[in-house]
């Protein structure tokens, strides 16, 4: 089971660049959508299976959040290049900056033996869900040229940026709070 869980994580690591190339070089938006959707689903399953079958590994714990960030950054850069929008670019900068900041906080807290200060919150899970839903909707909208889909995806990405700011502030407060 450990090998299967690691396979899922590694498949997510390589899916980000594949999604980017499919969408931006080959204009295969529907295939990019499907691979992105599969990556989002495997993000849930690799952690679930690892915990359920005691197949967690220290390498998996390191690679899993890296895979999340690679997929997110590749997809947001891809969408920015396809849309060429300052608005989407600005939201993407907020989202990516938050991911880097919180990763730094988590590393700091890990070194201090205080990992609970930045354990994943429910709000952060909603943030991730809105990011993934928005990105999937963008690729689906590209595939079928859905103007309403682009509008809704942009609004959901805006909500995701707000959640990114809120969770970054929460984690920052938790990290630097005395106790």
What label would you give each PLM region?
Residues 26, 54-55:
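Membrane-interface helix caps and helix-loop-helix hairpins in membrane proteins
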Residues 8, 15-19:
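N-terminal signal-anchor transmembrane alpha helix
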Residues 22-28:
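Membrane-interface transmembrane helices that cradle and orient dolichyl/undecaprenyl
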Residues 2, 13, 21, 34, ...:
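A feature for the membrane-embedded catalytic helix bundles of lipid/isoprenoid biosynthetic enzymes
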Residues 1-7, 58-64, 119:
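Short, amphipathic, aromatic/basic-enriched membrane-interface segments that mark the entry/exit
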């Amino acid at each position: 089971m450990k090998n299967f869980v690691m396979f899922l994580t590694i498949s997510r690591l390589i899916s980000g660049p594949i999604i980017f190339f499919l969408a931006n070089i080959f204009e295969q938006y529907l295939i990019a959508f499907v691979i992105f959707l599969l990556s989002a689903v495997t993000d849930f399953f690799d952690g679930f299976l690892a915990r359920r079958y005691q197949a967690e590994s220290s390498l998996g714990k390191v690679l899993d959040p890296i895979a999340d960030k690679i997929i997110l950054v590749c997809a947001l850069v891809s969408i920015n290049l396809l849309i060429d929008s300052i608005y989407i670019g600005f939201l993407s900068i907020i989202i990516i900056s938050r991911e880097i900041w919180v990763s730094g906080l988590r590393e700091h807290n890990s070194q201090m033996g205080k990992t609970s200060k930045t354990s994943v919150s429910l709000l952060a899970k909603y943030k991730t869900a809105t990011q993934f839903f928005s990105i999937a909707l963008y690729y689906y909208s590209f595939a079928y040229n859905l103007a309403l889909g682009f509008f809704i995806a942009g609004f959901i990405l805006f909500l995701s940026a707000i959640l990114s700011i809120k969770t970054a502030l929460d984690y920052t407060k938790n990290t630097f709070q005395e106790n």
